[in-house]
């Protein structure tokens, strides 16, 4: 019953086949008795075995989105399998590995979170041309030298053969002329090939740079909800390996394809002039080779997409593990994390195995057809020489040019398969590049002449796009007057930080609206608004740069070092900063600063902005008691500054932090349940009073 529920309907049977074990599962990671499978399909087990095993039962469970099968193997029971059954299993296996068999299928290897639409080769090339169009002279120079080099190279066999036979005939004048032309062609080809390689390398650099610039810029201006559905490892994989894979199109693939198409066309014309019957035979063989090449190229395109997805998933696991290394080390889960990473590596190896097998078939096809061309040329050409229809010199030229044509076809096919891989990798990159920026960055909002800081939440409700069935905030009505300090408290998950995210316009309310000085928030210029808001989060993030740059981060006005030091002193960060080896020039590192020190730098950053609206989301949670007391005094002075009249919103679990607030809003399950001063809420004996009592009891 468990197998039917989890979709594990097939029972893998392992048989001995020339010391190569075969298992009837496709996506299999063999770690002792643990295997991850998506669907029943044949794949190789890389472990050799001389014994037969039979799998009587399988217990299924879900591990990281895959199905884990814990199998029990028993020795000796393989002898009960009849010879006819073994032969039938071997025949079934051989049938699956034939072209078109199930072993070659990738139908459900990857469940992508962001499904990309297929991109045609022409569409991909036109997109790449758009990226390099500003430097089209580099492309033109590259292709111009390519044409000269290709034409020079294709004429070399003619003069090489003519030189040999003119020397044999004793015609010295013709021999000297042919040698001079041969030297000229070789020198011209060498010079143009070098210039061609240089210009194509420059074009490759331009393409990958522009592609990464465009993709990075596009991602920067997406809604926050987009990043909620994507992982950092996946996005960095698009910027890194995927863009690099696509950039090979101009510098390598198109370069070699055009070069060999020119040379192959020249060789074919020359062959038809020499002997049209032999030329047609060679052309037929090249057409067969081209058909095989097309099928192989399409297969390579599909494998490239899967390798792209699996590589991104592997990068995601590695990045997550490295970023949480302290947690991994404390809980001793190194082996589990290795198994998670190895899961994706095994899937990558499984696809690469089939990719290598496909390449082997393509290579076998080429060599077979290549040697067939030689046999036909020698057979038919020899008979033609005996009949007096052609000369030995003509046959020699024919053999050289037929070989050139076949190899040109092979190189076109090889690079075309690489081109198809690059096009497959480009699908997700181009689809991300086509994403429209957030409406906040497109529309030009209103900029108020004077901002007083009057904030109103009017019947605001909100659900996160990733789980829109759950209402995080419901019908919230809160008003914050200029110069007022309003604290928001409640249990975890009650919607406190969500209100801050809505005020910062990281998300739009599902219903209701937020007013700032009577103007709907969505009508205001986002950049202008955020420049007037100071925000300190409960887990402040600092950039890997010096402390001074972190403090002045986001300020659009000229900031002096004295301003930075003044803000740091107000945040009680100056003393520990000056104690660091390089003071304010110290590069921030996670191991260098404690959580409290990071929070004080974040508070200094907010103070330096001189904001009209100050938002503190658990801004003192990582501070010690003395630092918290000092910072609270600074924050009170900031909020009560008569010259600026800042509006301050404080979110805190430490209720001692917000007792002096003008008003306290208590929230529960996304709703406002109480509102008033500290004394008023204590007298109501409601949620706030219960929270206060619990914290006091915890202290005692």
Curated annotation (Swiss-Prot):
What cellular-component terms does GO give this entry? chloroplast; chloroplast envelope; chloroplast membrane; mitochondrion
Give TM segment ranges. Answer: 137-157, 182-202, 268-288
SMART domains, per database record: AAA (SM00382)
Q: Which residues form the ABC transmembrane type-1 domain?
A: 139-421
Record bears the keyword S-adenosyl-L-methionine: no
Q: Which Gene3D superfamilies match?
A: ABC transporter type 1, transmembrane domain, P-loop containing nucleotide triphosphate hydrolases
Transit peptide: which residues?
1-59
The family annotation for this protein states:
Belongs to the ABC transporter superfamily. ABCB family. Multidrug resistance exporter (TC 3.A.1.201) subfamily.
Record's protein name:
ABC transporter B family member 26, chloroplastic
Q: What is the lineage of its organism?
A: Eukaryota, Viridiplantae, Streptophyta, Embryophyta, Tracheophyta
């Amino acid at each position: 019953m468990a197998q039917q529920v989890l979709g594990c309907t097939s029972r893998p049977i392992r048989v001995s086949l020339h010391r190569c074990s075969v298992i009837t599962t496709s996506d299999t990671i063999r770690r002792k008795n643990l295997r991850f499978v998506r669907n029943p399909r044949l794949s190789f087990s890389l472990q050799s075995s001389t014994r037969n095993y039979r799998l009587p039962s399988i217990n299924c469970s879900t591990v990281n989105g895959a199905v884990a099968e814990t199998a029990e193997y028993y020795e000796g029971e393989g002898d009960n399998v009849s010879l006819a059954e073994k032969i039938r299993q071997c025949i079934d296996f051989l049938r699956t590995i034939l072209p078109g068999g199930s072993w070659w299928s990738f139908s459900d290897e990857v469940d992508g979170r962001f499904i990309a639409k297929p991109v045609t080769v022409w569409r991909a090339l036109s997109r790449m041309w758009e990226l390099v169009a500003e430097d089209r002279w580099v492309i033109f120079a590259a292709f111009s030298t390519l044409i000269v080099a290709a034409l020079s190279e294709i004429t070399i066999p003619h003069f090489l053969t003519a030189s040999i036979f003119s020397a044999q005939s004793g015609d010295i004048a013709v021999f000297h002329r042919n040698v001079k032309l041969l030297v000229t062609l070789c020198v011209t080809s060498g010079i143009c090939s070098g210039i061609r390689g240089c210009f194509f390398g420059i074009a490759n650099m331009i393409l990958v740079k522009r592609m990464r610039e465009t993709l990075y810029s596009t991602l920067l201006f997406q809604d926050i909800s987009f990043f909620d559905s994507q992982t950092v490892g996946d996005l960095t994989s698009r910027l890194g390996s995927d863009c690099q894979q696509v950039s090979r199109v101009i510098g390598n693939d198109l370069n070699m394809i055009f070069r060999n198409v020119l040379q192959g066309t020249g060789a074919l014309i020359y062959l038809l002039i020499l002997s049209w019957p032999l030329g047609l035979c060679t052309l037929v063989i090249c057409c067969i080779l081209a058909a095989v090449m097309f099928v192989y190229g399409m297969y390579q395109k599909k494998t490239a997409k899967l390798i792209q997805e699996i590589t991104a998933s592997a990068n995601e696991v590695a990045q997550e593990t490295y970023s949480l290394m302290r947690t991994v080390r404390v809980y001793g889960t190194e082996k589990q994390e290795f198994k998670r990473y190895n899961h994706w590596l095994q899937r990558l190896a499984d696809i690469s195995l089939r990719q290598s097998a496909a390449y082997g078939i393509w290579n076998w096809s080429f060599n077979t057809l290549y040697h067939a061309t030689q046999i036909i040329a020698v057979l038919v050409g020899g008979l033609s020489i005996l009949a007096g229809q052609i000369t030995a010199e003509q046959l020699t030229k024919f053999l050289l040019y037929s070989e050139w044509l076949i190899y040109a076809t092979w190189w076109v096919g090889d690079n075309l398969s690489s081109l198809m891989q690059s096009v497959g990798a480009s699908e997700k990159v181009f689809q991300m590049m086509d994403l429209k920026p957030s409406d906040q960055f497109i529309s030009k909002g209103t900029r108020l002449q004077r901002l007083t800081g009057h904030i109103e939440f009017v019947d605001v409700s909100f659900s996160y796009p990733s789980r829109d069935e759950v209402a995080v905030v419901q019908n919230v009505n809160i008003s914050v007057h200029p110069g007022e300090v309003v604290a928001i408290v409640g249990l975890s998950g009650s919607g406190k930080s969500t209100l801050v995210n809505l005020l910062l316009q990281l998300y739009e309310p599902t219903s209701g609206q937020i007013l700032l000085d009577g103007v709907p928030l969505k009508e205001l210029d986002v950049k202008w608004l955020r420049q007037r808001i100071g925000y300190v989060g409960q887990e402040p993030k600092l950039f890997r740069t010096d402390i001074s740059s972190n403090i002045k981060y986001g300020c659009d006005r000229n900031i002096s070092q004295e301003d930075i030091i003044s803000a740091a002193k107000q945040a009680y960060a100056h003393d520990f900063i000056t104690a660091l080896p390089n003071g304010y020039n110290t590069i921030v590192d996670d191991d260098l600063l404690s959580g409290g020190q990071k929070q004080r730098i974040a508070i200094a950053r907010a103070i330096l902005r001189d904001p009209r609206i100050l938002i503190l989301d658990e801004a003192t949670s990582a501070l010690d008691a003395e630092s918290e007391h000092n910072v609270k005094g600074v924050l009170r002075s900031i909020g009560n500054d008569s010259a600026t009249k800042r509006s301050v919103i404080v979110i805190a679990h430490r209720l001692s932090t917000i007792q002096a607030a003008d008003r306290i809003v208590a929230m529960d399950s996304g709703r406002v349940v109480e509102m008033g001063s500290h004394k008023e809420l204590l007298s109501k004996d409601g949620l706030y009073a219960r929270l206060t009592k619990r914290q006091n009891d915890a202290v005692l």
